[in-house]
Amino acid sequence: TGRGAGGMIGGLVAGAIDPNIMASLGGGRPAVLVTGTNGKSTTTRMLAGAVRTKYAVATNDGGDNMDAGIISALMAGKDASHLVLEVDELHVPHVADSLNPQVLVLLNLTRDQLDRVGEINKIERALRGAVEAHPDMLVIANCDDVLMTSVAYDAKNVIWVSAGAGWLGDSVTCPRTGGHVVRTEDDWYAVKPLADGREFRRPQPTWGVDKRGIITPTAKRPLNLALPGRANRGNAAQAIAAAVAGFGVDLDKAIAAAESIDDVAGRYSTIHWKGREIRLLLAKNPAGWQEALSMVDRSADGLVIATDDASVAPATAPELEAAR
């Protein structure tokens, strides 16, 4: 019909009838929330698969990550023992208040949908407030992302993961002080101290990922993902860390679950058409474009870029043609 999959309709109706239904449906079940500008759906799919090796899981695997979609997922998974939920950045504070999550996964923050969310420091402050409001919550945070590091910097229970930060244009200053951020190959720090005199610097990670495998506090394991791209290796590292540290999932089972994901709501899927193999990639902001273009197979016969904004195509086509 062209009207979408309808994943939020039930939640919209239920939320209108009972404004407190999210908390009621949550029922105190152990929950993990996954948030960030890019990688939410992929990380949630990997994490849900890992937690599912030990528990029954309810999740919004269609990417419906606002209130209505979350409520729909909770209604569909009423018999599940655990909740693994992708949550829009601006919805995290009240979703956390409703579900009191056991774990919060913080991926990255960059410019996205400025007409809706405004400047990203607003999101950083909102997420930081959610962390402060739930001091017992385990936070799995990307220490390579300056903004997410600020969100989790004062958390009492935090695991730092070196998941990478491909796009740096939105984190040239400290979100708390405005001080310039200096970067080296494997470190960053703000030249201006925090209000209490502490240095704001990249924390030392206990989890990480490189081209060969995933690094844990006790071991290094191979990591052979079906999904392309450096960013997805970082997503996998955070998903695996959350499953192991947050829910006691066996490390090897968590890795296998992440490796088994080859399609996320159509993203990264491969289509065979008229004798050709077509790989679909999605990008919706500058950071996503940078990552998607890095995944392009330079030996491919062709590259097609499609946009849902008609005003973009005429302006962009000559530049793309010139770059061929």
How should each PLM-predicted stretch be described?
Residues L33-K54, S98, A254-Y268, A287-V296:
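Short, compositionally biased "basic patch" segments
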Residues T1-W160, W167, T173:
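Phosphate-binding loop of NTP-binding sites
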Residues M8, R29, T42, N65, ...:
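Conserved active-site and cofactor/substrate-binding residues in soluble primary-metabolism enzymes
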Residues V264, L282-R324:
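Active-site beta-alpha connecting loops in nucleotide-dependent enzymes
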Residues L47, V51, I70-L74, A236-G246, ...:
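Buried hydrophobic packing segments
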Residues G36-T37, G62, A163, A256, ...:
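Cofactor-binding loop segments of dinucleotide-utilizing enzymes, especially the Rossmann-like FAD-
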Residues N157-A287:
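Adenine nucleotide phosphate-binding catalytic loops in nucleotide-utilizing enzymes
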